Amino acid sequence: LDMEEEDFLSAELEIVPAGKARDCGLDRSMVIGYGQDDRVCAFTSLFAMLETENPERTSCCILVDKEEIGSVGATGMHSRFFEDYVAELMALTEDGNPLKVRRALRNSYMLSSDVSAAFDPLYADAFEKKNTAYFGRGLVFNKFTGSRGKNNSNDANAEYIAKVRQVLDNNEVGFQTAEMGRVDLGGGGTIAYIMANYGMNVIDSGVAVLSMHAPYEVTSKADIYEAYRGYKAFLKDIK
């Protein structure tokens, strides 16, 4: 490589574990690999979007960066790039009224696709066993996330949750509901609250992950498949 020391001044390095993702478990029912938070949700969301034909509502899949440090910067969800794109689309209509941009955002439905913490028997005290995610039970929904209760979280309303449930039930998609660990012990943040600030209906959904943020994370193949099916059903049938 024709590289000099000064090139590192403007380099952007992405250093990750060298091992490839592989089967895990005696029955090979799981996947082990680095960065499944949140590649596993990006993968399922993108494929669901690409394979959805002629949805009744205008649909999109947004892949954003910097969630772990507050969704800041030009590529984080706090950036106004999505709002700008909606405005650009509205400007192409006969009436480019800025008020319609806000109405379009407010009338939108969103699944905030992010992983959830799978129950870990080695750290059972960190979970509420009757309200946590388990492997093999399907797509996970979190009514709220945050930490210390609902701090810095979105709180999905009951009517929207019922609407999403109906879509999944009609398409026979396996799903479960969960918290992100016990109150005052667990917790985690997503981008859901940012989009909810527009008034749109948002709920967190994703795949349960074991050993989240470890060099190698573990997910269930069945859950990955149900996430893909659930996202596709949402794009096709949400009204």
Enumerate the language-model features and the residues they cover.
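Short acidic, glycine/serine/threonine-rich loops at helix termini
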Residues: L26-D27, S71-G76, P121-A124, Y216-V218
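His/Asp/Glu-rich mid-to-C-terminal helical/loop segments that flank catalytic regions of hydrolases
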Residues: L50-L63, E88, V207-K239
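Acidic, glycine-rich active-site loops and adjacent beta-strand->loop/helix elements
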Residues: G19-A21, L63-S71, G76, V115-A117, ...
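A glycine-rich helix N-cap at a beta->alpha junction
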Residues: S79-L111
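Active-site-adjacent substrate-binding region
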Residues: E6, S116-Y123, F127-A214
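Soluble metallo-hydrolase cores and metallopeptidase-like ectodomains found primarily
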Residues: L1-G33, E51-T52
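Alpha-helical metal-binding/catalytic segments enriched in His/Glu/Asp
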Residues: I32-G73, R80, D84-Y85, G230-K232
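Flexible, glycine/charged-enriched surface loops at secondary-structure junctions
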Residues: D2-E12, P55-C61, D95-N107, L168-R182, ...
